[in-house]
Amino acid sequence: MNVIWSSHVQGIRTLYDSRKLRFDDRFAEQYKALFQLDGNVSLKLLEIGCGPGALAEVLHHWYPKTRITALDRDSAFVQFAKSKEHGVTFLEGDATALPFGNNSFDVTVSNTVSEHVEPSKFFGEQLRVLKPGGVCLVLSSRKGIHIPAKCLADSEYEQAFWEKVARFDDSMEKYGVCKYPMSEAQLPEAMERYGFHDVQTGYVTVDLTPDDPKVSPHMALTMIEAQRSNDLDALASVKNTIPEQGTDAELAQMRRLINAKYDLRLAQYARGEKQWDTSVSVIMAVRGKK
């Protein structure tokens, strides 16, 4: 059972909640314009590195006629995804050795996976399993904007804790996180180099601002709670990865401080006290054909 990523890098709630926001229906038309998929045709689509299944779930909603298979090497992600979405086939597997025959799929898609996998294997396996004329879609996060609410600033205790953790945390190197980063120019170049043609690029802007009047109260609260999940998952990762750097008492105090901050932010929202905190993600979409 492989649970390295969910235990040491990004927790289930962090990935699922943040991706559900990133692929919310408010941004659907931006994505669809770049994907250029025919929703009236019964396509076979493979998502590589699906995590806890948020993107596969959304794709099933956007393209109900498409038969979707989603694969990840983390057992906990796959188990969670299966419990959330029954219209998708979720499997454990390796992006560098896809368990499918040649020419099996019409579309492959991945989200924030390319930077973690050796490029010749990442693109080579997709080229192999795609049918002639099949489409490869690679989504990659680019530099965005993150302005937190003032009440979410770290206290001196939190700052000291995270500084201590940073001195000893080698999980990025140990687990090959972002081992193969590529710039906005290098990513489409790599897709061409490994056999794809008609390569195109585009960008989706995901604006998450809870106090924006256009944002529903439900969505605003979801945005705030997703940030809370991210911080709590980061704390859990410390316990899993370098437990000697966080005593039970320290971790309990950190949880109290984190929850108190987010409870205050929720109270501010409920009272109509606008903070104008925002998170703007820029998602690069690269599309190529076999």
Give names to the regions the model predicted.
Residues V138-S229:
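Conserved catalytic/acceptor-binding region of the Class I
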Residues Y180-P181, Q200-K289:
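Conserved Class I S-adenosyl-L-methionine
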